Amino acid sequence: MNQTLLSSFGTPFERVELALDALREGRGVMVLDDEDRENEGDMIFPAETMTVEQMALTIRHGSGIVCLCITEDRRKQLDLPMMVENNTSAYGTGFTVTIEAAEGVTTGVSAADRVTTVRAAIKDGAKPSDLNRPGHVFPLRAQAGGVLTRGGHTEATIDLMTLAGFKPAGVLCELTNDDGTMARAPECIAFAGQHNMAVVTIEDLVAYRQAHERKAS
């Protein structure tokens, strides 16, 4: 990742800490991966605190594929089958079947309905019958071990939520440009500045976790 673009957001470790602060303050975070991977920026929000306004922003400026990142334990708790048995996508993204809250929604498409679905999936004691399938929210199963196992936005989201003190569940959506093309780092950074979001890279998070795990050992 071009460090010059990111310099105004501090050092890699400072960027992670600022991202955690943003999440705790109820703000979003822009998570960038490497130029040689997807080369995309994802808007992420804690599943516990995401507002209807934030969901509307995500739908308006994102790809439209609003995803709920969850752990394998939560996937099993909700009895959500993986979308396919043989995942042949380029990066092995762990989509499950799509979901909708069983109660409290209309068509499931609106920002409010999608927030209701997210809350239904992550609440304490959530059970399979709390969700209908299919729906308009796309759960993503994160790999155990987070970004140290797989350097994806899904794992980064779970790691950031955990480090910030939230349940291991977060909402993400890829940022797109107004013409429908994918936003790259310069556009993602500009958007984050306009919407008071912190910016962090997956590379930053890997280094941060590695350093803290070395200290712990």
Curated annotation (Swiss-Prot):
Pathway(s) this gene product operates in, as recorded in its UniProt entry: Cofactor biosynthesis; riboflavin biosynthesis; 2-hydroxy-3-oxobutyl phosphate from D-ribulose 5-phosphate: step 1/1
One GO term (biological process): riboflavin biosynthetic process
Chain residues that bind Mg(2+) 1: E38
Cofactor annotation: Mg(2+); Mn(2+)
Gene Ontology cellular-component annotations: cytosol
Keyword Lyase part of the UniProt annotation: yes
Keywords, in A-Z order: Lyase, Magnesium, Manganese, Metal-binding, Riboflavin biosynthesis
Site description Essential for catalytic activity, residues in chain: H136, E174
Matches recorded under InterPro entries: DHBP_synth_RibB-like_a/b_dom (IPR017945), DHBP_synthase_RibB (IPR000422)
Pfam families: DHBP_synthase
Reactions accelerated catalytically: D-ribulose 5-phosphate = (2S)-2-hydroxy-3-oxobutyl phosphate + formate + H(+)
GO molecular function: 3,4-dihydroxy-2-butanone-4-phosphate synthase activity; magnesium ion binding; manganese ion binding
EC number(s) given by UniProt: 4.1.99.12
Cofactor details (free text): Binds 2 divalent metal cations per subunit. Magnesium or manganese.
Function, as annotated: Catalyzes the conversion of D-ribulose 5-phosphate to formate and 3,4-dihydroxy-2-butanone 4-phosphate.
UniProt subunit comment: Homodimer.
Protein family: Belongs to the DHBP synthase family.
UniProt protein name: 3,4-dihydroxy-2-butanone 4-phosphate synthase
